[in-house]
UniProtKB/Swiss-Prot annotation:
Protein's recorded name: ATP-dependent zinc metalloprotease FTSH 6, chloroplastic
Gene field: FTSH6
Binding residues annotated for ATP, in chain numbering: G261, P262, P263, G264, T265, G266, K267, T268
GO CC annotations on file: chloroplast thylakoid membrane
PANTHER family (alphabetical): ATP-DEPENDENT ZINC METALLOPROTEASE FTSH 6, CHLOROPLASTIC, METALLOPROTEASE M41 FTSH
Biased composition range(s): Polar residues: 1-14
Presence of the UniProt keyword Plastid in the record: yes
Subcellular location: Plastid, Chloroplast thylakoid membrane
Source organism of this protein record: Oryza sativa subsp. japonica
Length: 686
């Protein structure tokens, strides 16, 4: 039943039919309801009257729009006449009258759910009177029975109502327009008296965290292992504290400093240090905080950020992960209309555009993906300095360990210099995590000091994962032992490889066994062809031991990770380092080497199919030569390998010194290295 009919029924159901004594039917008496009492406004309503027009429009637009939309009025339907619907009859009694032939005429309303029938009632004073019957729909049996009884019946269709149509139009169009008008009215006049960002609800406001006197708790003394970057930042601090010292000779303050480096190398830590040392207002935010779902928000937030920064100049603005907003234009799906590109254009203008100037605002940005940044963002005048914060070397790692170990109780036997040598490729964050894991492990074991054992176990856990359950004696354990000893022997007997630090059968992560090497003191940025080839030989040593000892049918999938790493290194030798018979060519596309998916898709290979086939052949030649060298090591030193496997099966962990002592009983390691180098040279020149 529609709301209209429902209200009608409620009103008329209580009106009885009366008959006058004179024999005529009396008119229905209607009682006029008393007028609604008007309650004077309370104190709360007077307070509501004092609300601003902004809140009033917002409440009206949202409340009325949503409320009326949720309760949309139904279409007006034809209803039973009011004067004939006051007498009701149940459906079952109506059927009894119909079976008795006392029903003369039936009119159906409201899609067959209500019927007004003329009934011949002998018991009533008026033999024929009209009653209202509520029907359960319009059953087919009822229609058939009406036809059989010869009853005259008719259905009254829905009649449109002008009032309801007007209300529908108001709900569909009026309130949304009122809501939009309220937004347009309040945005420029109420929130933007200064002519700044004019987006509603503060969407155009920058989310940068502002600190007038930054108290980050970090100084340059807390930053270790990045001396070159510290020196550049200390100059920035001098620029901000004593600008007259540099302006006297015509120098200007650098507008921007871009920190580039892998994750965890201390870029954000450097920004915290300069904020704590400079003593000037500091704004900090992430590159992702510029972009929202609304168009124009990013550019508006950039304008607001620099307006606030210029008002507080001299000051620092730190944008972390700037690649979220500063990536190369034209690479996105949206092209030049992309919201990110509009934000970047506004950032370029604010830093050094027609409206930009030397306002004493220094922008510091950090990213670990400099290859995807827009070229216009990297030019001098915007980011005058580009500081590389790379992975620390041995000395840098030792300095970082000293900083993070200052508040920890270390055993006198712990040498941080040795720990630094054992952690090549560790970033500052990795080293901090290492010292924390060692402290947790010492507390778990009930020790009051961190010993070498906790340091070693923490390194293994960070690099390889959690320690698993030891394998039971059997063929699988023996196969893993031969595999790991094969790695260690082939690496030790090949010139240019690092020394073995330990060999273990204790599972960690997905690995059933591990062989650790201790890097030398050479510069890791300068690696020779001999060292790379030795690494490939050592990587294939496990597979070679499986094939020589157990036969080719017994080779397992345990070397899958080794093969992936070996193939990747060999391909880089050919395409990036020019260490093959193809020649000293750079055959790798820089864009294809990056991590950005869009740039990799857009990068076009400039090599022919024949050159690609030559590259594959050169990679295969390098891997095949290294595999033959590894199998030769295993065949010539089978007795030493068998003894080493027996010791490893018994102890499960074999130290580097003990390993070399047992191997030296069977072979002259130095002589074997020289002979291997000579054979490798012959293969390379053949």
């Amino acid at each position: 039943m529609s709301p209209t009919a429902m209200s009608l029924t409620t009103t008329t159901s209580r009106l009885p039919i009366c008959r006058a004594q004179g024999g005529g039917v009396a008119k229905e008496k209607r009682t006029t309801p008393p007028p609604a009492k008007i309650t004077p406004p309370s104190s709360s309503s007077s307070e509501a009257a004092g609300l601003s027009r902004r809140r009033l429009l917002q409440s009206a637009g949202l409340g009325l729009g949503l409320g009326l939309t949720a309760a949309r009025p139904a279409r007006a339907e034809a209803t039973a006449p009011e004067e004939v619907t006051s007498n009701r009859m149940s459906y079952s009694r109506f059927l009894e009258y119909l079976d008795a032939g006392a029903v003369k005429k039936v009119d159906f309303f409201e899609n067959g759910t209500v019927a007004v029938a003329e009934v011949d009632d002998a018991a009533a004073l008026s033999r024929v009177h009209r009653v209202k019957v509520q029907l359960p729909g319009l059953p087919a049996e009822l229609v058939r029975k009406l036809r059989d009884k010869g009853v005259d019946f008719a259905a009254h269709p829905v009649e449109p109502s002008a009032g309801v149509m007007l209300l529908d139009l108001l709900v569909n169009f009026g309130f949304p327009l009122l809501f939009v008008a309220s937004l347009l009215w309040r945005s420029p006049t109420m929130n933007n008296p200064g002519g700044g960002p004019s987006l509603p609800f503060g969407l155009g406001k920058s989310k940068a965290k502002f600190q007038m006197e930054p108290k980050t708790g970090v100084t340059f003394d807390d930053v270790a292992g990045v001396d070159e970057a510290k020196q550049d930042f200390q100059e920035i601090v001098q620029f901000l504290k004593f600008p007259e010292k540099f302006t006297a000779v015509g120098a200007r303050t650098p507008k921007g400093v871009l920190l580039v480096g892998p994750p965890g190398t201390g870029k954000t830590l450097l920004a915290k240090a300069i904020a704590g040392e400079a003593g000037v207002p500091f704004f900090s935010l992430s590159g992702s905080e510029f972009i929202e779902m609304f168009v124009g928000v990013g550019a508006s937030r950039v304008r607001d950020l620099f307006d606030r920064a210029k008002a507080s100049a001299p000051c620092l603005v730190f944008i972390d992960e700037i690649d979220a907003v500063g990536r190369q234009r034209g690479a996105g799906i949206g092209g030049g209309n992309d919201e990110r590109e509009q934000t970047l254009n506004q950032l370029l203008t604010e830093m050094d555009g027609f409206g930009g100037g030397d306002g004493g605002v220094v922008v510091i940005a950090a990213t670990n993906r400099p290859e995807i940044l827009d070229a216009a963002l990297l030019r001098p005048g915007r980011f005058d300095r580009r500081v590389s914060v790379g992975l620390p070397d041995v000395r840098g790692r030792e300095e970082i360990l000293l900083v993070h170990g200052a508040n920890k109780r270390l055993d006198p036997g712990v040498s941080l210099a040795v720990v630094a040598m054992r952690t090549p490729g560790f970033s500052g964050a990795d080293l901090a995590n290492l010292m924390n894991e060692a402290a947790i492990l010492a507390g778990r074991r009930g020790k009051d000091r961190i010993t070498v054992s906790e340091i070693d176990d923490s390194i293994d856990r960070i690099v390889a994962g959690l320690e698993g359950t030891s394998m039971t004696d059997g063929k699988s354990k023996m196969l893993v032992a031969y595999h790991e000893i094969g790695h260690a022997v082939c690496a030790t007997l090949t010139a240019g490889h690092d020394e073995v630090q330990k060999v273990t059968l204790i599972p960690r992560g997905q690995a059933r066994g591990l062989t650790w090497f201790l890097p030398g003191e050479e510069d890791p940025a300068l690696v020779s062809r001999q060292q790379i080839f030795a690494g490939i030989v050592g990587g294939l040593g496990g597979r070679a031991a499986e094939e020589v000892v157990f036969g080719e049918p017994e080779v397992t999938t345990g070397a899958a990770g080794d093969l992936q790493q070996v193939t990747r290194v060999a391909r880089r030798m050919v395409t990036a380092f020019g260490m093959s018979e193809i020649g000293p060519w750079a055959l790798a596309e820089p864009a294809a080497q990056g991590g950005d998916v869009v740039l990799r898709m857009l990068a076009r290979s400039s090599m022919s199919e024949r050159l690609a086939a030559d590259i594959d052949a050169a990679v295969r030649t390098i891997v095949d030569e290294a595999y033959e060298v590894a199998k030769a090591h295993v065949r010539r030193n089978r007795a030493a390998i068998d003894q080493l496997v027996d010791v490893l099966m018994e102890k499960e962990t074999l130290g580097g010194d003990e390993f070399r002592a047992i191997l030296s009983e069977h072979v002259d390691i130095g002589k074997e290295r020289r002979e291997t180098a000579a054979r490798t040279q012959q293969l390379a020149t053949a």
